[in-house]
Structure formats: structure tokens, C-alpha cells
Regions:
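N-terminal leader/signal peptides at the extreme start of proteins
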Residues: 1-15
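N-terminal single-pass transmembrane signal-anchor helix
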Residues: 12-38
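Alpha-helix exit/C-cap motif
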Residues: 59-79
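N-terminal amphipathic/basic membrane-interacting segments and domains
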Residues: 74, 78-82, 89, 95-99
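Mixed-charge, low-complexity intrinsically disordered regions
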Residues: 81-82, 86-88, 113-118
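Short, surface-exposed interaction loops/tails
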Residues: 99-139
């Protein structure tokens, strides 16, 4: 009888429970070693992404600041005269960004009016009334 059991056992193929447990333990050990490495790569990728986003924001803010505080240049189309000040045709005029309007008369080349408005101030000059200003800042 024992001989028969031994023969039956030799004919059966497969893994024993102990062999399966050993394989599972080896896989778990490998996974435990790999997980920290993978997490480091994920952290590095997130840091690189954050740095890239910050650089993009910096460039955008710099462009907006340059836009907001830059000066606009205009070439005088004709000779402009007003209150003893003459600007000859072709002269480059520099105006603060945000200037709303500057008008002149085509017939005689005189400057008729100028107005400027920013967040807290409104300034206007006209030939008839001269300078006027309003401070719109809340105090």
C-alpha cells in the first residue's frame, strides 16, 4: 500500500503549498523594494511639473508687468502747437501706457485735448479749460 501511494505521488505534477508560499514571499519582497523607488520617481516628476508651472507663471506675470508699465510711442503726424509748446511733424512722442485719447485739429495742427486714465487718477487737458484732475482712489 505504501508503495502504491509513493507511485501515485510521483505521477502527479504541480507545486506544493510550501513552494507557492515561497514564491509569493519573494514577489512581496521584490515589491517592497520597488515601491519606494517608484514613489521617488513620481515625486521627482511632480516637482519638475511644479517648477515648470511656476516658470510659466513667472513669464506671464513679467509680460503683464511689462505691458502695464511700458510706454507707447507715437510719431507726430503734423506740427502740433499748444500754449507755446510746438512738436514738429515726425517727432516721436512717448506716452504712458493707458493714455485714452489725444486729439488735434487737422486744419491748423494745434493740439486740442489730451486725457489719461489709470486705476486711481483721471487727468485731462483741453485747449479751452486747461488741466483738470480727479483722484478716484478710495481713502
Amino acid at each position: 500500500m505504501v508503495k502504491r501511494l509513493r507511485e501515485n505521488r510521483k505521477n502527479k505534477k504541480g507545486f506544493t503549498l510550501v513552494e507557492l508560499i515561497v514564491v509569493i514571499v519573494i514577489i512581496l519582497v521584490l515589491a517592497a523594494v520597488m515601491v519606494p523607488s517608484v514613489l521617488r520617481y513620481v515625486d521627482k516628476a511632480n516637482q519638475a511639473n511644479t517648477k515648470s508651472d511656476a516658470a510659466t507663471i513667472l513669464v506671464d506675470v513679467q509680460a503683464q508687468i511689462a505691458d502695464a508699465y511700458s510706454a507707447a510711442t507715437v510719431t507726430a503726424p503734423t506740427d502740433l502747437k499748444s500754449n507755446g509748446v510746438t512738436v514738429t511733424k515726425g517727432t516721436t512722442l512717448i506716452a504712458a501706457k493707458g493714455a485714452k485719447a489725444a486729439t488735434y485739429s487737422e486744419t491748423n495742427g494745434d493740439l486740442e485735448s489730451f486725457s489719461y486714465c489709470d486705476t486711481n487718477h483721471w487727468i485731462q487737458w483741453s485747449k479751452e479749460k486747461g488741466w483738470s484732475a480727479v483722484d478716484t482712489a478710495l481713502k
